[in-house]
């Protein structure tokens, strides 16, 4: 069954995939490029272990029997050997790809052991870090806590001192304002008394002046009355004198 499938797949009449043979039974570089793959390394430390060396890897089919089967189906010996060489090379490339992309159970166990060793190393480093760095951090935190407590105490003392100073200043200012208000009140009372005294004196002077003015007005009225009488008397005497003179001239004129 296997020989018939290979015959249908590799027959030279074009019914299957056409293969190009190369000398010495090797694949061309263009054909090899399609089967080459790249693998990436892990980030952790790993010791490369090759469980199955290349010389110990065996093919899964009998190449001699396959050559004979191909010869019985119309291939000559050179073509049969070339086809078997190509199949062998393809199998080796496939095995290389499988061994590069996959691991065996033994490789997995070795990798797990390496990972566990790496984790143990990390755990030891963490313990050392906890004993050293964490202790230093704890000491630094305690030191900072003590410094913060000291700063807090200093701030409390400074706040209390400032509050006491402000309270004293407020009391002094209140006393000063009270004294100033008392002095102003005393000065206001004295000014009020002085104003009342001045007002009384002014009223007394005004009253005396008014009395003097009334007296002067009365005396002026009396003087005016007396002057009026004197004037009337003078005018009457003047009139009588003028009449007497006029009568004298009249008599004198009549007699002449």
UniProtKB/Swiss-Prot annotation:
Belongs to the CCDC90 family. Residues 1-42 form a transit peptide. It is found in: Mitochondrion membrane. Residues 129-167 form a coiled coil. The lineage of its organism: Eukaryota, Metazoa, Chordata, Craniata, Vertebrata. Keywords: Coiled coil, Membrane, Mitochondrion, Transit peptide, Transmembrane, Transmembrane helix. Interacts with MCU. GO terms for cellular component: mitochondrial membrane; mitochondrion. The chain crosses the membrane at residues 231-253. This is Coiled-coil domain-containing protein 90B, mitochondrial. Gene3D superfamilies: 1.20.5.340. Its main location: mitochondrion. InterPro entries: CCDC90-like. It holds the Pfam family CCDC90-like. It is a single-pass membrane protein.
